[in-house]
Amino acid sequence: MATMVGKQKDIADLLNSLIELDLDAVEAYEAAIERIDDATDKAQLGAFKSDHERHVRDLTPLVSELGEEPVAEPDIKRVLTKGKVVLASIAGDRLILAAMKTNEDDTNKAYDRAVGRDDVPSHVREVLVRNRDDERRHRAYIEKRLSEYEAAKEEKAVSQREPPPPSGAPSVR
């Protein structure tokens, strides 16, 4: 699980765990992009997917530099990560974004832990900070969109209610 990422003793293992997490995220974004209806959200999710692909490209040579073999495929978690999005698609865009938010919560936590380590070489830390900043931006966008969906839902509920009688008028029951 992503909640374990950042706790690895070895830096190469840490970076490989982040690569797996980003590969999982790419798969989840592919599933979300296929299923989401809103064109703006679809485009934004495409940009976020590209960020995760860049994370993999940036982290991979760092693992090699540390003398280890970089992972090249998503972890088994991808089934769970992608599955949240597939199931959410049954109920629409808002739930797809909610599923993606849980995924972004995981990646944010993982990158926060990785950046917080004091044994990470400075050139590796620079990459981790850049990736973490991307993750924060992804989550902020998704949270904003979820808030907008909630506001629209509230507005619709209010507009469908019967208006109150004018002040001073007898109420009819």
List the predicted regions and their residue ranges.
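Alpha-helical bundle segments that constitute or directly flank the non-heme di-iron/ferroxidase center
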Residues: 2-37, 94-119
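Alpha-helical scaffold segments that form or flank carboxylate-/histidine-based iron centers
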Residues: 9-18, 37-57, 93-99, 122-134
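Preference for long, well-ordered alpha-helical segments
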Residues: 103-173
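Carboxylate-rich helix-loop segments that flank metal/cofactor sites and access channels
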Residues: 57, 61-108
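Membrane-interacting alpha-helical segments
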Residues: 2-12, 86-93, 145-157
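Long, non-catalytic architectural segments outside compact domain cores
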Residues: 2-4, 10, 24, 47-50, ...
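Conserved alpha-helical segments that form or flank metal/cofactor-binding pockets of metalloenzymes
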Residues: 40-76, 138-149
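Solvent-exposed, charged/polar functional surfaces in cytosolic regulatory/catalytic domains
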Residues: 28, 58, 62, 86, ...
